[in-house]
Amino acid sequence: MKFLKRGVALALLAAFALTTQPAQAYEKDKTYKITILHTNDHHGHFWRSEYGEYGLAAQKTLVDSIRKEVAQEGGGVLLLSGGDINTGVPESDLQDAEPDFRGMNLIGYDAMAVGNHEFDNPLTVLRQQEKWAKFPFLSANIYQKSTGERLFKPWAIFTRQDIKIAVIGLTTDDTAKIGNPEYFTDIEFRKPAEEAKVVIQELNMNEKPDVIIATTHMGHYDNGDHGSNAPGDVEMARSLPAGSLAMIVGGHSQDPVCMASENKKQVNYVPGTPCAPDKQNGIWIVQAHEWGKYVGRADFEFRNGEMKMVNYQLIPVNLKKKVTWDNGKSERVLYTPEIAENPQMLLLLTPFQNKGKVQLEVKIGSVNGLLEGDRSKVRFVQTNMGRVILAAQIARTGADFGVMSGGGIRDSIEAGDITYKSVLKVQPFGNIVVYADMSGKEVVDYLTRVAQMKPDSGAYPQLANVSFVAKEGKLTDLKIKGEPVDPAKTYRMATLSFNATGGDGYPRIDNKPGYVNTGFIDAEVLKEFIQQNSPLDAAAFTPKGEVSWL
């Protein structure tokens, strides 16, 4: 479990053969203790869940405790985020994640990677968030097209126990595809692995750090099998010189990276059990699932230029499991001892929580069963949540059928009362409902391309009033509203502005003569549909195998 720190990145390319030794400030033969703490994919969860799980108040208590422990042992701590602070919880979204960034300040984050969901808002909002934050937003591979300059700091330098640590930030280049294209007219996302090679060389030539760490928002894919996603941390680690990074603190795929065997993650990691991080090409790769459910802790010993990992764990933040007792009653119980919430953090966050609560908790309707919007479903199969959303868009636009990315569905709605908060958790991005009138031939071409979007990615399509069989890149038995598509007939398709402008790699339709931007926000359209059609019958929206991939 060792990393040999070298003066440069070990001949990154043939042109990188020149080496330089770091300017050592550490003492020879002395062992230094360095602890790296990490989270990722926070997605607006500044407050505890309805079951009392996670939240920044408990996270602060945990981090403060670890800092105290490490300090007593003479060590130093670095706290990093793998990005995606934005989007997911209405109380946060309505306030541009101000409570989240202010809470992270109070915890003492040192740096964060810029995630793709940081671009769910215009750049002006992101710049305001940088002002709120007392830590740097890092990304070496995001550039402004018009100037050729980076939009964010590529790295930050920290000193812990006389050890000079460089932290590089990198962002998935899928952002341009899966983000809102309207916000990227002057932004370029370069290949992060290629940019990493350049930055490592620059650091070793100029800054001469003792240790280099990357905080990334790129995703962890077993054995580098990234499918239709952009390459992630595993692929990058393999492309770099061995051991050129001590560690990659990741995000984006929202997994607990706990390996069951070489190149294979545990399928159902149990909170509080041992977690073995991934190691590729001499580089450790870690990720702490999502939402602040865990704080990852990596304890290293640094001696004579070598970094040795001596302990790693994912620490659950008040995570609970549902237990059913012999009497038939059930309750949620903690996996690990409860972590108290920090009073100072509660004092900071309570006004933010209360600010949006009144409007969000108003009942707008009800449903008699689960509307399935879980990430593990909407990116793989057709769901009734997708059908409800598309039914709302079809009703508003008078469309014949509807299409949207499964990744745009962010939550389920449980049986019972539905609030506006529930709707905003399902559709938090503020996309506009649009439609396009297309010939039958154009419909065939469009759906043929959309049907190539693979499961296990946000691009996987949710469809309504459409049936087909997809095989080897072609569609057969294609029907709209149960009738075969007539090439000469005109059809109206409802979708979202995100997909219409090329988001998730969908065909652009905003340049078609029959394209109309309705101006209606997707969550508002869904809210009104629920109000007008409650109580909803969940079973009535259940997919019946209309579309299949062979």
From Swiss-Prot:
Residue(s) at site: Transition state stabilizer: 117, 120
GO cellular component annotations of the record: outer membrane-bounded periplasmic space
Co-factor: note: Binds 2 Zn(2+) ions per subunit.
Cystine bridges: 258-275
Known cofactor(s): Zn(2+)
Annotated localization: Periplasm
Binding, Zn(2+) 2: 84, 116, 217, 252
Signal peptide segment: 1-25
Single Gene Ontology BP annotation: nucleotide catabolic process
Binding site for Zn(2+) 1: 41, 43, 84, 254
Positions contributing to substrate binding: 429, 498-504
Catalyzed reaction equations: UDP-sugar + H2O = UMP + alpha-D-aldose 1-phosphate; a ribonucleoside 5'-phosphate + H2O = a ribonucleoside + phosphate
Enzyme Commission numbers on file: 3.6.1.45, 3.1.3.5
An annotated Gene Ontology molecular function: UDP-sugar diphosphatase activity
Enzyme kind, highest EC tier: hydrolase
Pfam families documented for this protein: 5_nucleotid_C (PF02872), Metallophos (PF00149)
Entry keyword set: Disulfide bond, Hydrolase, Metal-binding, Nucleotide-binding, Periplasm, Signal, Zinc
NCBIfam families per record: PRK09558.1 (NF007109)
Membership in a protein family: Belongs to the 5'-nucleotidase family.
Job of this protein: Degradation of external UDP-glucose to uridine monophosphate and glucose-1-phosphate, which can then be used by the cell.
Protein name (Swiss-Prot/TrEMBL): Protein UshA
Lineage: Bacteria, Pseudomonadati, Pseudomonadota, Gammaproteobacteria, Enterobacterales
Gene: ushA
